[in-house]
């Protein structure tokens, strides 16, 4: 057995099964493991139970079982300043943000990594489904997780080479059922715990109610592109491009009984545009532009590449041509794409490798900007 005992790995433990098994595997491989619970949000639920307290109890139980020290660290201020303020600003601007991308970039692999280094960490590890491979030049490449259904490189696309150099993803070569069975075989306290879903700071709460606590809703008119008034919308921030449910229109108003979708927004007029048909013309675009474009390794200031891309999590890859200039990019699609949503991440791949990504600013149809914000 290689002597890993001199290598300290600090594991981000959430109280879930994935991070529990991450800590277990590293401990079994002989590393000097420390578990850290990050408290990023003050989240008392409607029954007055702080879910973070429950999760921390699970971290403590698992850490005791596998015999590692554990601590809790509070990143509520950093999370509020670097993730939540961004989340609200994006909604104010009529966009649909992806807080998980920002949380990984700013908290899990920045604030947490910085903290871990003060504990003498050689590496940090998380329960993400992704893989890191080091080439002969010492460059770290981020590859998709083996479990295609769970691959999380989309959310990790803003990580830098410096961050990846210090990162381990022990679950990357496993599929989710294998992770559960490892937890069950080891009798871990979290083996049967269900996966958390949704945005971390909202949890099981109603999204509309949550958002309205921070941003006052501004109801307005719901219109077709032809100018027909379809009623009132509850506030542009509650709707995302391509959304079907929650419009309150049903099959009415249309002669062909096709379902209705959100096909555009006009922030200045506070109008929500709706139209019939999954592939409504206004939902289809041929290119996008992105900002905050970033790659996992150093790239030229200006270049063009052919690769594949994802425009949302768990979507099949699409072929694209990317023209990069500084931290901006124009992405041209080989085939028209549906519901490209400003605020979401566009992530680039070369085969199994995640190259990086950016945040979508606008979608275009044959050179003309789509009215999505």
Swiss-Prot record:
Active site: 103 (nucleophile), 200 (cysteine persulfide intermediate)
Location relative to the cell: Cytoplasm
GO molecular function, one term: tRNA-uridine 2-sulfurtransferase activity
A Pfam family annotated for this UniProt entry: tRNA_Me_trans_C
Residues annotated to bind ATP: 12-19, 38, 127
Keywords assigned: ATP-binding, Cytoplasm, Disulfide bond, Nucleotide-binding, RNA-binding, Transferase, tRNA processing, tRNA-binding
SUPFAM superfamilies: Adenine nucleotide alpha hydrolases-like (SSF52402)
EC number(s) given by UniProt: 2.8.1.13
GO CC entries: cytoplasm
GO annotation terms (biological process): tRNA wobble position uridine thiolation
Region of interest (Interaction with tRNA), ranges: 150-152, 312-313
Residue span of region Interaction with target base in tRNA: 98-100
Cysteines joined through disulfide linkages: 103-200
Reactions catalysed, as given in the entry: S-sulfanyl-L-cysteinyl-[protein] + uridine(34) in tRNA + AH2 + ATP = 2-thiouridine(34) in tRNA + L-cysteinyl-[protein] + A + AMP + diphosphate + H(+)
Domain of life the protein comes from: Bacteria
Keyword Cytoplasm: yes
Marked site: Interaction with tRNA: 128, 344
Role noted for this protein: Catalyzes the 2-thiolation of uridine at the wobble position (U34) of tRNA, leading to the formation of s(2)U34.
PANTHER family: MITOCHONDRIAL TRNA-SPECIFIC 2-THIOURIDYLASE 1, TRNA 5-METHYLAMINOMETHYL-2-THIOURIDYLATE -METHYLTRANSFERASE
Family named by the database record: Belongs to the MnmA/TRMU family.
Name under which the protein is recorded: tRNA-specific 2-thiouridylase MnmA
Source taxonomy: Bacteria, Bacillati, Bacillota, Bacilli, Lactobacillales
Encoding gene (name): mnmA
